[in-house]
Amino acid sequence: MARRRSCQLHQVISLFTFAVGVNICLGVTANRIKRAEGWGEGPPTVLSDSPSINISGSCKGRCFELQEAGPPDCRCDNLCKSYSSCCLDFDELCLKTAGGWECTKDRCGEVRNEDHACHCSEDCLARGDCCTNYQVVCKGESHWVDDDCEEIKTPECPAGFVRPPLIIFSVDGFRASYMKKGSKVMPNIEKLRSCGTHSPYMRPVYPTKTFPNLYTLATGLYPESHGIVGNSMYDPVFDAHFNLRGREKFNHRWWGGQPLWITATKQGVIAGTFFWPVVIPHERRILTILQWLTLPDHERPSVYAFYSEQPDFSGHKYGPFGPEMTNPLRDIDKTVGQLMDGLKQLKLHRCVNVIFVGDHGMEDVTCDRTEFLSNYLTNVDDIILVPGTLGRIRPKFNNHAKYDPKVIIANLTCKKPDQHFKPYLKQHLPKRLHYANNRRIEDVHLLVERRWHVARKPLEVYKKPSGKCFFQGDHGFDNKVNSMQTVFVGYGPTFKYKTKVPPFENIELYNVMCDLLGLKPAPNNGTHGSLNHLLRTNTFRPTVPEEVTRPNYPGVMYLQSDFDLGCTCDDKAEPKNKLDELNKHLHIKESTEAETRKFRGSKNEIKENVNGNFEPRKERHLLYGRPAVLYRTRYDILYHTDFESGYSEIFLMPLWTSYTVSKQADVSDIPAHLTNCVRPDVRVSPSFSQSCLAYKNDKQMSYGFLFPPYLSSSPEAKYDAFLVTNMVPMYPAFKRIWNYFQRVLVKKYASERNGVNVISGPIFDYDYDGLHDTQDKIKQYVEGSSVPVPTHYYSILTSCLDFTQPADRCDGPLSVSAFVLPHRPDNDESCNSSEDESKWVEELLKMHTARVRDIEHLTSLDFFRKTSRSYPEILTLKTYLQTYESEI
């Protein structure tokens, strides 16, 4: 995407430490940032395993200091454990647990004991180190959770707070459906949800793994953009491996984009620690955040984060449906309660904004449901597979002469009737995944069916001495799968009160967090303003992008004899002058403005035409305004009875074609004498028209129509559908998909939704970066043809959200479904494509569902420009993904 190029800005960090298994330690402090421009193509700079540190210093008065001490001084910040640089007394002074984490009646008014983890003495409030329930137990106050919901219309902050602080409470592996357990298991989280702003779920990025998603939350970038494409990965330029246990993950060269804490620091806002090593108890993390909130104004951070390894750890071990999951969820809720009680104790509960958010969901998975590549390939020892809930394949040895990704794909495609994975070249993956444009993403990718794993061979799964499976749950699947969805709750003075919002993608949260802090976001993949409806007041107001190229409105009629395109449309059932009448009809219909126009008559004399067609009389088919072209080019607006097009003089095909299909519309067959009909369009110069001869001479390529002749409103209007300006190149295999979509599915959706508006067109993304290819870029991939072959075709179907209202008379919210269909010479993606189209085409469309924003980036077009809805509402519509999944 256009913003995706921000991966070349790389503000990077050395932040992650992982313990064995899934116990995660992630962290950064405000001063621990290194700058790199790009991904460090030069020699690697690996962190030393044994830095020269004098650990004999002391942490007295320094526990969890925000400033990182540099060598040779020892450290007392939250990450010193990760870097083996803590002072000798760090555990003794900073990780105290004596006395427990709560006040009891017996402890109220106790004599201060400096060995205690937190205090219940009379002076603890003044010193900012009370246990979080001190006021409740010792002073008779109520727990935050027991108070009624209150609408906080303006922040109520103590003097010195220039902005409401933001606390990000992130939980690993929190499946969205866990929220159904409600207040009996999670009363504090449920109160945040019911009193604040929440969505039914939040969609993670693909792959639905921890590292990619935590860093996406921090940067607003897709993994292909920020570079963390998995929990483990190989960079062929670095010739280095990144994984959870190795030290290479500390190297800043892997981390792209600009995370929130860098955005804050660069704009003069202090950021606290973002993630915490697993050795630091949750209670200590909360108490530390609360203590930071009491720092002097010039030291106090404005943004904080808490990170919990649960419920992911238990979800892997027991599965998402195991009864053992209840206690980990109770523990998380207890920690949330400690935070909220602590904020109330500091009189900050009406001041601070809190985001409770997950990184991904969890699915029921066991070893028994594993596909082994050894059952498909004879050479599994020659490949490296990143296994599990997705598969990434590369050769075992670099520059392996016999390794061919296409051969691997062929040997894995549709080999068994019960196959539980689907192989793709990465450029053929659904565009909605945004998982291709990075050298760390292997050429061969396996999308694995939910609840299944993939491995090279059985030994690599059952390798434990017991031979038993050691997990019951996992994640990483397609990010539209309902079990992969996670939680989002926003609570505080800036969030709306008791508000439910539609689901959204986690790439959008970075912009929201910047808005909450009054920051200007760095370039990112989110759509700034699309989540304005979450907030009580909006500091950012998005504006409609400027149109770069305005269209032409053809004013010259060419003679039929001017065309020698090899196109015929013989209709022996009609009078001889039928086509001449149809051509005149093309020129004058849908006209309004009395503009003098000139056209060439049958004898080349100049004639006057006072009925110009500069604008349509009624926006019958462009219900939401004409799409804007956001790059320099040349294109014409062509009006017809049943559709309108923006015809490219560069690509010799429409950039878009729009039409509206009513619920009552009929689907008619094409008469036999018109099955091969293609008409020249006398409004467009022959030099800007396709040649039908090219298709006759190319047996591998056919053509289709963007407006379907099947939906023509009359026999006369049907001829418009056969114009060469409605024609696009299509592989014969793809025509089966396109024709079924137009003939059957469009009518089906129109019937179900009380009419739909359809906009369809070509996509050119030869370099699979998710962006519209320029003409020069296309020439690099397409030689010897004036008509480039699209890599994909898109279609956007819009109706009224309230199906009782017709699509063309909708005065309420809109509903949209969009598709980006790969244009390929075969239908191997669907293993049953030899069957009737009714058995497989719609499922293929659902796999390639997309957001309107995806299509806008792929085409450099801007849709929905003329509507009564607010622009933020339109952005919300554009960023919505129809997943076709069952309710969570």
UniProtKB/Swiss-Prot annotation:
Q: Where does 1-(9Z-octadecenoyl)-sn-glycero-3-phosphate bind?
A: 210, 231, 312, 475
Q: Which GO terms describe its cellular component?
A: extracellular space; membrane
- Leader sequence residues: 1-27
Q: Which cofactor does it need?
A: Zn(2+); Ca(2+)
Per the Swiss-Prot or TrEMBL record, the active site comprises 210 (nucleophile)
Q: Which residues does the record annotate as propeptide?
A: 28-35
- Intrachain disulfide bonds: 59-76, 63-94, 74-87, 80-86, 103-120, 108-138, 118-131, 124-130, 149-195, 157-351, 367-469, 414-831, 567-692, 569-677, 800-810
Q: Which residues form the SMB domain?
A: 55-98, 99-143
The tissues where this chain's protein is expressed are given as: Detected in fetal serum (at protein level).
Q: Motif Cell attachment site: which ranges?
A: 127-129
Q: What class of enzyme is it?
A: hydrolase
Q: Region annotation Phosphodiesterase: residue ranges?
A: 145-502
| Reaction(s) catalysed by this chain's protein | a 1-O-alkyl-sn-glycero-3-phosphoethanolamine + H2O = a 1-O-alkyl-sn-glycero-3-phosphate + ethanolamine + H(+); a 1-acyl-sn-glycero-3-phosphoethanolamine + H2O = a 1-acyl-sn-glycero-3-phosphate + ethanolamine + H(+); 1-(9Z-octadecenoyl)-sn-glycero-3-phosphoethanolamine + H2O = 1-(9Z-octadecenoyl)-sn-glycero-3-phosphate + ethanolamine + H(+); a 1-O-alkyl-sn-glycero-3-phosphocholine + H2O = a 1-O-alkyl-sn-glycero-3-phosphate + choline + H(+)
Q: Write out the residues that bind Zn(2+) 2.
A: 312, 316, 475
The post-translation modification note in this UniProt entry reads:
N-glycosylation, but not furin-cleavage, plays a critical role on secretion and on lysoPLD activity.
Record's keyword annotation contains Protein transport: no
Q: What is its EC number?
A: 3.1.4.39, 3.1.4.4
Q: How is the cofactor bound?
A: Binds 2 Zn(2+) ions per subunit.
- Gene3D superfamilies xref list: 4.10.410.20, Alkaline Phosphatase, subunit A, Extracellular Endonuclease, subunit A
Which molecular function term from Gene Ontology is one that the record holds?
Answer: lysophospholipase activity
Which residues make up the binding site for 1-hexadecanoyl-sn-glycero-3-phosphate? 210, 231, 312, 475
* Glycan attachment residues as annotated in the record: 54, 411, 525, 832
**Job description of the protein:** Secreted lysophospholipase D that hydrolyzes lysophospholipids to produce the signaling molecule lysophosphatidic acid (LPA) in extracellular fluids. Its major substrate is lysophosphatidylcholine. Can also act on sphingosylphosphorylcholine producing sphingosine-1-phosphate, a modulator of cell motility. Can hydrolyze, in vitro, bis-pNPP, to some extent pNP-TMP, and barely ATP. Involved in several motility-related processes such as angiogenesis and neurite outgrowth. Acts as an angiogenic factor by stimulating migration of smooth muscle cells and microtubule formation.
Name by which UniProt lists this protein: Autotaxin
Organism expressing this protein natively: Bos taurus (Bovine)
Annotated gene: ENPP2
